């Protein structure tokens, strides 16, 4: 069973041990970098450990992007040993549900590195669509939650 749980002192070491494939390193932030950003943006960032039963298998972080005044899927990774099992799809759904329940969002945004075909497939399958806008080298995608 997949679940999202807050980052705590009890699970941070397991989170920091997550790893991705070498070919994913240019697309995905490390958990350490993501948690540093969560610390700085603690009022608007929502980091979670992704669990499969009692094992941490990933990390997801949503946030409020103040510049554009919208909620975003900011960081997302599934450990290389747990990919291609549907875990990411379910974690993404739960992350979106968190934003819908907590903030009654009508839309969620994310950024995708233009040549990241895997992310485009995952987000496209979840209903995200490209907006045609680019920022910081990322292609903006939007999910209509209404």
Can you describe what each PLM-predicted range is?
Residues 109-120, 136-139, 146:
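Conserved beta-strand-loop-alpha-helix junction that forms the acyl-donor binding cleft
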Residues 89, 114-132:
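Conserved active-site alpha-helix within GNAT-family acetyltransferase domains
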Residues 82, 86-94:
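Conserved acetyl-CoA pyrophosphate-binding loop and the N-cap/start of the following alpha-helix
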Residues 100-111:
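Conserved GNAT acetyl-CoA-binding A-motif
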Residues 79-81, 85, 114-115:
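Active-site acidic-Proline motif in GNAT/NAT acetyltransferases
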Residues 125-126, 137-141:
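Short, Lys/Arg-rich amphipathic alpha-helical interaction segments
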Residues 91-94, 98, 122:
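Structural preference for long, well-ordered alpha-helical segments within the folded cores
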Residues 2-74, 79-81, 98, 131-136:
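Acetyl-CoA-dependent GNAT
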């Amino acid at each position: 069973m997949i679940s999202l749980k807050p980052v705590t002192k009890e699970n941070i070491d397991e989170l920091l041990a997550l790893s991705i494939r070498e070919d994913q390193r240019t697309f995905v932030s490390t958990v350490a970098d993501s948690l540093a950003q969560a610390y700085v943006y603690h009022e608007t960032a929502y980091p979670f450990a992704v669990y499969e039963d009692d094992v941490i298998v990933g990390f997801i972080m949503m946030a409020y992007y103040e510049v554009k005044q919208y909620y975003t899927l900011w960081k997302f990774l599934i450990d290389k040993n747990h990919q291609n099992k549907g875990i990411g799809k379910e974690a993404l759904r739960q992350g979106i549900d968190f934003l819908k329940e907590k903030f009654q969002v009508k839309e969620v945004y994310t950024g995708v590195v233009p040549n990241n075909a895997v992310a485009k497939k995952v987000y496209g399958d979840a209903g995200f669509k490209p907006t045609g806008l680019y920022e910081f080298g990322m292609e903006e995608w939007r999910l209509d939650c209404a």
